[in-house]
Amino acid sequence: MGARASVLTGGKLDQWESIYLRPGGKKKYRMKHLVWASRELERFACNPGLMDTADGCAKLLNQLEPALKTGSEELRSLYNALAVLYCVHSRIQIHNTQEALDKIKEKQEQHKPEPKNPEAGAAAATDSNISRNYPLVQTAQGQMVHQPLTPRTLNAWVKVIEEKAFSPEVIPMFMALSEGATPSDLNTMLNTVGGHQAAMQMLKEVINEEAADWDRTHPVPVGPLPPGQLRDPRGSDIAGTTSTLAEQVAWMTANPPVPVGDIYRRWIVLGLNRIVRMYSPVSILEIKQGPKEPFRDYVDRFYKTLRAEQATQEVKNWMTETLLVQNANPDCKQLLKALGPGATLEEMMTACQGVGGPAHKARVLAEAMSQVQQPTTSVFAQRGNFKGIRKPIKCFNCGKEGHLARNCKAPRRGGCWKCGQEGHQMKDCKNEGRQFFREELVSLQRETRKLPPDNNKERAHSPATRELWVSGGEEHTGEGDAGEPGEDRELSVPTFNFPQITLWQRPVITVKIGKEVREALLDTGADDTVIEELQLEGKWKPKMIGGIGGFIKVRQYDNITVDIQGRKAVGTVLVGPTPVNIIGRNLLTQIGCTLNFPISPIETVPVKLKPGMDGPKVKQWPLTTEKIEALREICTEMEKEGKISRIGPENPYNTPIFAIKKKDSTKWRKLVDFRELNKRTQDFWEVQLGIPHPAGLKQKKSVTVLDVGDAYFSCPLDKDFRKYTAFTIPSINNETPGIRYQYNVLPQGWKGSPAIFQSTMTKILEPFREKHPEIIIYQYMDDLYVGSDLELAQHREAVEDLRDHLLKWGFTTPDKKHQKEPPFLWMGYELHPDKWTVQPIKLPEKDVWTVNDIQKLVGKLNWASQIYPGIRVKQLCKLIRGTKALTEVVNFTEEAELELAENREILKEPLHGVYYDPGKELVAEIQKQGQGQWTYQIYQELHKNLKTGKYAKMRSAHTNDIKQLVEVVRKVATESIVIWGKTPKFRLPVQKEVWEAWWTDHWQATWIPEWEFVNTPPLVKLWYQLETEPISGAETFYVDGAANRETKLGKAGFVTDRGRQKVVSIADTTNQKAELQAILMALQESGRDVNIVTDSQYAMGIIHSQPDKSESELVSQIIEELIKKERVYLSWVPAHKGIGGNEQVDKLVSSGIRKILFLDGIEKAQEDHDRYHSNWKAMASDFNLPPIVAKEIVASCDKCQLKGEAMHGQVNCSPGVWQLDCTHLEGKIILVAVHVASGYLEAEVIPAETGQETAYFILKLAGRWPVKVIHTDNGSNFTSATVKAACWWANIKQEFGIPYNPQSQGAVESMNKELKKIIGQIRDQAEHLKTAVQMAVFIHNFKRKGGIGGYTAGERIIDIIATDIQTTNLQTQILKVQNFRVYYRDSRDPIWKGPAKLLWKGEGAVVIQDNGDIKVVPRRKAKIIRDYGKQMAGDGCVASGQDENQEME
């Protein structure tokens, strides 16, 4: 049903349009509100026809009222409109919406039925706060009966998903539509969502997680249930998969009830929240009002994002009270703060209506200018006091006559009042003869700039400034072309005598419209020409136009002649209440007016493709009409500016383009997919290897920070390479050939643009640096830091020279990002005249921390550690060790909470760094903080740090302070060389004797800097020293340990040269732990001096590195014992070589331990399982192990006992059937394909769940294996046209499963779980997920045996395909044989019989079937011929001449 506009007629419509939307407001109801209401009713599955009568409106109000509490703002607006409409139909006199709502409330209270008894009244009062939208209703007999959801409710839910697509409004809409529903109803709602399979998969995973959590917290009661008692629901019962509708109703209506429907709704809402966060990733903190954005639009964005935030209502209320005002633009914020803290949203909207942006400023300017233009009486009107006639005074600020600049009411203009340029005042202006407001700038007698000399013809456009040209082919004529005396009017090329308007001021000129003269602004951003109240002849028609300040009503006059600077244009003029007269593009294009951007005349950098490669030839994909129109408009402007050029069909290259809408804007942005060109383009060397650091800056008296605008588009591209950047704008339905362009400048997104721009900028700045050696310029991409020791005026003059120098080469430096006064914001730092710091850092306060929150927190702390000494993050980093999802909640340990609290205290006091003085020495001081964490300061004067930092890496499990100190020194030295070009003098907390004792043995490890000792506790020392020679007279201990890898039982012991021996049994150990345990026993049983001999290289390596800390408890105990000894000698001998004491102790500890280790293959099987986690069948088969041994290896692996051994066995399906599905892991998408008959697996991580990626995967699969049928779910990627086209081309039949029916995708669903399980077992062996996926696929296909035939999946698929080929060939042979007939003679009967059917042909006989009898006939008595139809057997029979071997073999 369409939108209804005829609900009211006659007097009712007049009454409707006299009612105000708000009390005290200005806006009234209009016809459009009725149309909107009817459309909204269709969305909510209500009949718009009910709006025609009062009774119908009452029914609609009763239907919508229960959902008001949880509904959106749109629902409330609809309810309000219907309430007003009801009053109009009922002839109830009201003046605004609030009065209508009051009347409705009165009516409802009057018609409210009186309760018969107090209990009924109490029940009614209780029910009044509860929605009556319950599918469970009570019958007359008192039984609770379930009413299924109506098709109208389901239709409303589907429309919500289609229109909103998981925006934040979906959650309250779902809550409203599903109130009181059973799990079966909720599953019905979910099943109606056909597309969005990725979102549904996420929802399914959340429901599974919540169901598992429910089962953990609600264990099954022990023992049988009493008769008649309901069982407790499990998680799967609540989700509606293992419970019936009757059970759900029984739980919900029991006493006490179990609200399974509400619990399931809560789970679904949790999943929807996660989906909404993915579809709406913008945080509420990022919602800020733009300088030109209306307050109303900002509030809409704010509340839309607020609904998506996962926070409590109290937190959301706080966000509304603080962030809404805090993030408004300055114009609105000033008004909002004036309203006070208790202001309502309505008051805010009213106060900020029309505030901010160009429209607001234009109105202020227009008011000021109108006051200025009023005739005023000035003291200078009495001119009789002066000799001669003087010219009237003129304002330098606004250019009007009659007042001085100090009395001007117009907004103050920045820059010089004489020439209009920034950077100096009028009294310091050196631009003689140039007047900012002189008439020549807006008339034909204007200066014409000098064109470049003829030897620079290569440049396309090279104006000295960005200017607005009124260009054309004709020459201008008029008086005053010769110019005034003293003015330079030299023209290098007469044919280019174009009028030129600089943009140092607003381009306002005088134009003649019809017969009237007006001042108007030339606006290249406006589509239409709009003039304030003007009397024009001819017919007009009303029109509504939208601008920055809102909609205004105008009169449209067509075919109006407009004279602009002597050029005439005929077009449409709109007349209405505009704050500024505007000449738009509809007239500017007729007179040839262009906005010219300079392209630099610099030498281009030659670029080539990689050897052997050609340019990209990627077809342009289809685009929508609005995108094509947007791209045409953008490219037309770029072509006028010389950035791109049109090309013909001779260029064979193409790169696809597309368009996206800019953030929070209706404008489009052009994007070019240069991925293919980037692959083929030569590699570039980044000329800048890092970003500059403020600690390396020398202190300067004057500083300025600049930003280069339109950087890439001001830099030319190599002419020979331009052809490879070609792209095409297509047309709808191939109406016309596509428009072809190529780039003339560096394109955005191309790999060479950054390096070429940096190199070009360096060449451009080189002559300026030579000319001004006193100026220091730090350049990083388009950010420029300019420092000098000149006086401020001289410095700013030099900066203007730099800006002019860049401008000559085509690089502009916008005033908006020109920082003249400190503090300067540069590269994330805040620079002051004598100090620097990082930009303000505020650590978030959170009750719940996720992995992503911790990562951001650690990043902030690392950034702050540049200047804040003492910051530590080791305990915080421990919280997020391992592979975790970004949204996983993290529980703080006590150590991490303490560390964060200490960091907060450190950041409370702002700290600053100083600048570098080349005349002073660099000093680096290092302190030990404990727990493997170090901090350092680099300074030139004590307590004035240039830079600070921290170090907390532990490169091995067993280390000591000396090792870590060496690593800190190496880091600080490298950092100093990068920033200052030299190494500092180190002050280390270690005594010289300890340091030199270490370096005596480890001098070859690294380089030693210059250093001195500083007594800063805690000091670094070596806690024990190992002897280099055996200790004479000390007892010698031969130590050894052994462990059984299967039982984890072991022994450790020692034998001494004095006859002592000891052996202990150890549980749950390994060979390496047993060896260390033996050394610990020797140290505990020995005296102050001891010699120890071991055959373990592992133990020898740990102890010889002299660690003083370790993550191993056993090694820590050994360290404690070593510190107690006076002298220790440790030696190693090879095992099992007949060495006396070693052999004795080896026999001692091996007794009862190493028996099973003599089985061949166990070591190899263990290594194979550690790497691939093979199942026991594969190991038993590959390494000839008994099944019990192989099973024990699997049982001893902690990673293989998560869910037990996988179940195997597949349905014997057709060999060509594959099942495909997408699963999600670590936030990435894995596309899985399973060969149903064999269980063989193909999987791949794909960048996006799109049809294109899926089709590419299917084609790769079809290229490797015979694929006849693919079975998928109904996901949008599988149902896409791209996949259908790929299946058609590869002759693959596509079948679809049933949504939410796991049996339809059983093979691939179970394989998804198996794949994730294998990935979990080997994830720590791979850095990237895509590597882990391929490793898991290899393990599944070739390292797991079982199922049909006891094969691996790889062997099984090969066997199935080979068998299928053989049976197909055999069937072909059988069919061939059956095409022949046999004539035969039986016994001695000379008459040929037949024809009989040939069943099989052997070497000596054939098997035939004749009249149902199967006979074996010798070959010599049979004649085989092809069946040519009916033949007569006899003497002249064709059988006698037929060769039986003809066409038979």
From Swiss-Prot:
Residues 518-587 form the Peptidase A2 domain. The gene is gag-pol. Mg(2+) 2 binds at residues 1040, 1075, 1095, 1146. Pfam families: Gag_p17, Gag_p24_C, IN_DBD_C, Integrase_Zn, RNase_H, rve, RVP, RVT_1. Residues 1031-1154 form the RNase H type-1 domain. The lineage of its organism: Viruses, Riboviria, Pararnavirae, Artverviricota, Revtraviricetes. Its cofactor is Mg(2+). A motif (Nuclear localization signal) lies at residues 26-32. Its EC number is 3.4.23.16, 2.7.7.49, 2.7.7.7, 3.1.26.13. The modification Phosphotyrosine is found at residue 134. This is Gag-Pol polyprotein. Residues 1380-1427 bind DNA.
